[in-house]
A protein has these predicted regions:
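The feature marks the mature, well-folded catalytic cores of soluble enzymes
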Residues: 1-101, 111-315
Length: 315
């Protein structure tokens, strides 16, 4: 298992580092690769999306590094090491952001650290269009052991405050079987250019996820852009079921990663469905190369491409 998933991470690292700088957090030194910086920090797990900084950038290029509390998806798993990574990186002058901010940090880098550790929020639980709208799911943000006793209204106001959002669109259906996160939106619905939403669908009425995904689709049809127009909806196929013993795994094509000039897309050795998913994603990103990454080894850990990465603004 370790060798299999290590090979997958190597492939992801190569594809990213070909196009942009890469920062890897690891517990020990490793052989360097081009455009890659290694930071030696212990962690509980590999899901950088959920404990990494959420970065806001204004029109003048100033960055705000939001450090929210990560508590192992509602205290399901240990998280104390993961929850300390952001502060450690910041003290080391990482991530390497634009010098537009002041004062500069260690190593001459910059960016304003914002302590949001009194509020639980995972990066995989939100999607933003960069124009004032943030999408999230009620299943995740209102789940026990995250931000109780805060109400939905109080949580929404905090999201608007910290993320500088004008509105929050809540998705009430769609949690995938085997998803430990209580319904992260990055497994279900992704925002793409031209007000396009790529979302997971299911055409098999006998599939246990069929009803929830159908209800999610119906809700998405009611959503409007901040300008009052319907979103352009594109449905992604559902991979045929993966199991770990008797447990179904949350395989999804929505967990793709947008990088410079490319989109890295999870595949599952299902040529027909993989090709269909890559075609649909390619239609949403016509100016980017679409690169498939076999993520069968990662999905065995109940995550995928987007889950194990977190982007930062370029220098």
């Amino acid at each position: 298992m370790l060798g299999e998933i290590t090979a997958t991470y190597h492939e992801i690292a190569r594809e990213i580092s070909r196009r942009e700088n890469l920062l890897i957090v690891a517990p020990e030194e490793a052989q360097p690769i081009i455009n890659c910086q290694l930071s030696i920090i212990n962690s509980n797990d590999t899901w950088a999306r959920d404990h990494g900084f959420i970065t806001l950038t204004d029109d003048e290029g100033h960055h705000r590094l939001l450090d929210f509390c990560f508590n192992g998806w509602g205290e399901k798993f240990p998280a104390e090491l993961d929850n300390a990574i952001n502060r450690r990186l910041y003290d080391e002058g990482l991530p390497p952001l634009s010098p537009a901010d002041s004062p500069p940090r260690a190593g001459g880098q910059s960016g304003k650290y914002v302590d949001c550790l009194d509020f639980v929020l995972e990066g995989g639980s939100i999607e933003s269009d960069g124009r004032g709208t943030v999408f999230t799911t009620t299943g995740c943000l209102l789940a026990p052991h995250r931000n109780q006793p805060l109400t939905k209204t109080q949580i929404e106001e905090r999201l608007k405050l910290e993320l500088h959002a004008e509105r929050i669109l809540w998705i009430d259906h769609g949690n995938l079987t085997g998803d430990d996160t209580d319904g992260h939106i990055d497994t279900l619905v992704r925002i793409c250019p031209e007000d396009t939403l790529l979302y997971m669908g299911c055409d098999d009425p006998d599939d246990e996820q069929y009803d929830e995904l159908r209800l999610m689709e119906e809700q998405l049809k009611t959503f409007r852009t901040i300008d009052g127009r319907p979103y352009r909806l594109k449905k992604l196929p559902m991979p045929r079921p993966f199991y770990d013993g008797d447990d179904r795994l949350p395989a999804t094509y929505a967990n793709f990663l947008i990088i410079n000039d490319a989109v890295l897309c999870p595949t599952y050795a299902q040529p027909d469905l993989d090709a269909e998913a890559l075609r649909i994603i390619g239609e949403a990103f016509p100016d980017r190369e679409i690169v498939g990454i076999d993520c069968r080894s990662i999905i065995k850990q109940h995550g995928s491409l987007h889950c194990c990465t977190m982007q930062f603004p370029s220098i």
